[in-house]
């Protein structure tokens, strides 16, 4: 009997008792079909306050999760489950989690889920370590734990022996909107990767323009359907064209 191993990087591991102690997923754990292990980035900090977040470069509200505690927690998860495990970040910027996508994930031997908090996680962690980003809808939650539990629940239902049949319920559609821009926090340089200069400039007008351009570009590349019902202003069209020119020239 195969066991799906799910490693979760989260600041709130106790939340996942909802998966391991209740319902179909709990039964799957008891049957040996599912194993869920949590890794808390706070356990990998070195300061007395166990700091896992910092202010975003370029200003703005909220905090951004720091890269080093995330990397160290991920390293432990990889060691436990194997380097081949797919790393998934639960994010409103990700692709829509459909039943077809869940079927593919259910075929994996192991998964590593990253549950963010605050304004998100340092973009450099995503670029370096995340294989896929998945979203459960175009709405705001306090963190990635609930989406991670949704994914685990949906995948578990497709494991042979967990249900006795496959649930093929349809997923709800997204509402319209733009995806978020990249976020960065300290350090300014990590593994030879620099934060974009505009975010260090202190010029708030330039920062706002850069963020809107990145948001438009990401939406065009990842969720072009969201732009179909959105009327872009002249400035937004100009920014999107500029983004595409810069992308093609790079």
From Swiss-Prot:
Disulfide bonds: none annotated. InterPro entries: Alpha/beta_knot_MTases, tRNA_m1G_MeTrfase_C_sf, tRNA_m1G_MeTrfase_TrmD, tRNA_m1G_MTases_N, tRNA_MeTrfase_TRMD/TRM10. Its main location: cytoplasm. It is found in: Cytoplasm. Its EC number is 2.1.1.228. It is an enzyme of class 2 (transferase). Keywords: Cytoplasm, Methyltransferase, S-adenosyl-L-methionine, Transferase, tRNA processing. GO terms for cellular component: cytosol. It catalyses: guanosine(37) in tRNA + S-adenosyl-L-methionine = N(1)-methylguanosine(37) in tRNA + S-adenosyl-L-homocysteine + H(+). S-adenosyl-L-methionine binds at residues 116, 136-141. Homodimer. HAMAP family: TrmD. Belongs to the RNA methyltransferase TrmD family. This is tRNA (guanine-N(1)-)-methyltransferase.
